[in-house]
Design a protein with these regions (language model features):
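Conserved C-terminal helix/tail region of periplasmic/extracytoplasmic solute-binding proteins
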Residues: 316, 320-359
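Short, low-complexity disordered leader/linker segments with a strong preference
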Residues: 1-49, 348-359
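Secondary-structure end/capping motifs
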Residues: 250-329
Length: 359
C-alpha cells in the first residue's frame, strides 16, 4: 500500500477505505519490497565477520570447515574463528560482546544464561558423548575399581566434572569420599600427566585427546566409555557441547543467524564425511595438534548438528538430569524456553533488515 500510494496507484483517501486486514497485509508486503530495494546492489555475503570462539577439541571440530567454505567462496558469511584452551577464557569475552557466538559445554551455556539474565541463547547441539576413563595399567575394569583411587580430569564446573560425579554416584561411589579427583584447566595437561606417570594412573579424557594419548603411549587403555555408562543408567542423551549466540546479536541479525546455521550444518556434514580434509583443517587451525590424530579420532567424536525442537528436547532432558543431581551444575535453576533459539517471524526479520540498512 505504501509503495502503491507513492506510485500514484492508490490515493491516500482511497487507501483509508481498505479494511484493517488488507492494510496490514499491504504494509507487510511493502516493507518486504522496501527491504529488497535497499538490498539491491549489495553483496550476497555480509562484510561483517562473525566472531566465533571454540575450545581445542571435539566441540570445535565441526566448525573448521567453515573456513574451508570461506576460502572456496561457498560460505554465506565471513568467519573469525578463535580458539581457547579453557571455557573460562571464552565466557568474559562473550559477556562483554567481544564474541558473537561460541561452542561451549552444554551445562555452562545454561549457567551463563542465568548469569547474564538471558544474554545468550543456544542455537544447536554440536557434540554428544566423547568422555572416557583411561588407565596406564590394568587394574580398572569397572567403577567399583575406582574406589580409593586418584582420577585426573579436565573441565571442572563443566561437562566432565558433572558427568563423572553423576556416574560415580549411580555406581555406588561418593565422589567426595571414595575417590580423589584432581582437575586441570586443559585436557593437554592431563595427557602430559598421564605420559609422565609410571603406572596405574587414571584419567577422564575426551576425544580426540584419548586418541592422541594412546598414539604416544601404547600402555594407555580405555577402561570405561562414559557415554555407554550414561546410557546404561539414564534414558536421556549425553550432550557435551552446544553452540550459543548472544541474544542481542541474534535479535539484531536474524538473517546472519539463518545463514550461519545453514553454513554450520554443511560444515558438520563435511566433518563427518570428509575425514581427511577435516583432519587437515583441524591441524591447520590448531584444534588438534596433528592431522593424523584428528583423522583417527573424528569418527569417535560424535559431532552432530541438532537444532529446533530436537535440540530443545535433548538439551532440556539432559539439563534436568544434571539439575536433579546438582542444581549448581546448571546455574541454580533450569533455563526457560527463551534459552532455546527459534527462527524469528518474517516481520521481525524485515524490521531487523530495515534497522541494519539504516546504520
Amino acid at each position: 500500500m505504501v509503495l502503491q500510494i507513492f506510485c500514484g496507484k492508490i490515493s491516500p483517501n482511497e487507501s483509508e477505505e481498505l479494511n484493517p486486514m488488507k492494510k496490514l497485509t499491504s504494509l507487510l508486503l511493502s516493507l518486504v519490497l522496501m527491504v529488497s530495494v535497499l538490498a539491491c546492489g549489495a553483496s550476497a555475503k555480509t562484510s561483517t565477520k562473525v566472531r566465533i570462539a571454540g575450545l581445542k577439541g571435539p566441540t570445535t571440530m565441526g566448525l573448521v570447515n567453515l573456513l574451508s567454505m570461506e576460502k572456496d567462496g561457498t560460505a554465506s558469511l565471513d568467519y573469525d574463528l578463535q580458539l581457547y584452551g579453557a571455557a573460562d577464557e571464552i565466557v568474559p569475552k562473550l559477556i562483554k560482546g567481544e564474541l558473537d557466538m561460541a561452542a561451549i559445554p552444554a551445562n555452562l551455556a545454561a549457567t551463563l544464561y542465568q548469569k547474564t539474565n538471558g544474554g545468550i541463547q543456544v542455537m544447536a547441539v554440536n557434540t554428544l558423548g566423547v568422555l572416557y576413563v583411561v588407565e596406564k595399567g590394568n587394574t580398572v575394569h569397572s567403577f567399583a575399581d575406582l574406589k580409593g583411587r586418584t582420577i585426573l580430569s579436565t573441565g571442572k564446573g563443566t561437562t566432565p566434572e558433572y558427568v563423572l560425579r553423576y556416574l560415580l554416584k549411580k555406581n555406588g561411589l561418593d565422589p567426595d569420599k571414595d575417590v580423589k579427583i584432581e582437575y586441570y584447566s586443559e585436557a593437554s595437561e592431563v595427557t602430559a600427566q598421564m605420559a609422565a606417570a609410571k603406572k596405574d594412573a587414571i584419567a577422564v579424557l575426551p576425544q580426540p585427546y584419548v586418541t592422541a594419548a594412546q598414539m604416544k603411549d601404547s600402555d594407555l587403555r580405555v577402561v570405561l566409555d562414559l557415554t555407554r555408562e550414561w546410557n546404561r543408567v539414564c534414558d536421556t542423551q549425553l550432550i557435551t557441547g552446544v553452540t550459543v549466540v548472544r541474544t542481542e546479536y541474534a535479535k539484531q541479525n536474524p538473517d546472519v543467524i539463518a545463514a550461519f546455521l545453514t553454513d554450520y550444518q554443511k560444515s558438520v556434514k563435511a566433518a563427518n564425511e570428509d575425514i581427511d580434509g577435516t583432519a587437515a583443517l583441524c591441524e591447520e587451525v590448531g584444534v588438534v595438534a596433528k592431522a593424523a590424530i584428528a583423522k583417527k579420532a573424528l569418527p569417535k567424536c560424535n559431532i552432530v548438528y541438532r537444532n529446533g525442537q530436537e535440540m530443545k528436547k535433548d538439551i532440556s532432558a539432559y539439563l534436568q538430569v544434571l539439575y536433579d543431581a546438582s542444581p549448581a551444575a546448571v546455574g541454580g535453576k533450569l533455563p526457560d524456553d527463551n534459552f532455546y533459539y527459534t527462527e524469528p517471524s518474517v516481520l521481525r526479520k524485515v524490521m531487523a533488515a530495515i534497522r541494519n540498512s539504516a546504520k
